A protein has these predicted regions:
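Charge-rich, low-complexity N-terminal segments
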Residues: 1-58
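Short, internal acidic amphipathic alpha-helical interface segments
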Residues: 82-119
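Beta-strand/loop substructures that line and gate deep hydrophobic ligand-binding cavities in soluble
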Residues: 114-137
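Well-ordered alpha/beta subsegment
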Residues: 137-162
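Short, surface-exposed beta-strand/loop "edge" segments at domain boundaries and coil↔beta transitions
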Residues: 25, 72-75, 94-97, 135
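Helix-adjacent hinge/juxtasegments
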Residues: 57-90
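A structural preference for long, well-packed, hydrophobic secondary-structure segments
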Residues: 96, 105, 121, 130-132, ...
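Conserved short hydrophobic interaction patches
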Residues: 33, 37, 105, 152, ...
Length: 162
């Protein structure tokens, strides 16, 4: 049996939010506005779909932080480290609503956001607009969820930067 590969070019809308707040202030604000994914939810997800899991997912925040990675420390390999953290942000229930129609959309669920220290002492937040990521799968149900995420993520990140 042989494998096949296909490629296509997709258009992605990239968003940059610039803030006069310091990296530490924006990071702190983001982490207070968007809670970390509940440990109990992680356990329930690991154990499989149950009634308790569904109840918890339906009551969960619209967005949660799944993971974070300190990219600023990596800069220490080449220069002085800076404040830079990448986040995976999303919602397990929302992800399942997307991937049930297009499993490939799991590439982008949860979403990635980076917050970093700008050269001027302020900070920047960058991310790809969810609807533009999900539009490539050609399923309006998936893109529609992406539009809702555009709003939710945009509000949270703008509030953190503001």
């Amino acid at each position: 049996m042989s494998a096949s590969t296909s490629r296509r070019i997709v258009e992605i809308a990239h968003v940059v939010i610039t803030s006069t707040k310091s990296f530490a202030e924006v990071r702190s604000a983001l982490e207070s506005l968007v809670p970390w994914l509940d440990d109990e939810l992680r356990e329930l997800l690991r154990d499989g779909v149950t009634d308790r899991l569904r109840q918890r997912l339906e009551a969960a925040p619209v967005l949660s932080i799944f993971e974070s990675r300190d990219h600023g420390m990596l800069l220490g390999l080449y220069m002085h480290p800076r404040g830079a953290v990448q986040y995976e942000i999303g919602n397990p229930l929302t992800a399942s609503r997307i991937t049930r129609y297009a499993l490939g959309a799991g590439l982008y669920a949860p979403l990635r956001v980076i917050v970093y220290e700008a050269d001027n002492g302020g900070s920047r937040i960058e991310y790809d607009l969810p609807s533009s990521l999900f539009d490539q799968f050609g399923d309006e149900r998936v893109t529609e969820v992406g539009h809702a995420l555009d709003v939710a993520l945009g509000r949270a990140l703008s509030a953190a930067a503001g």
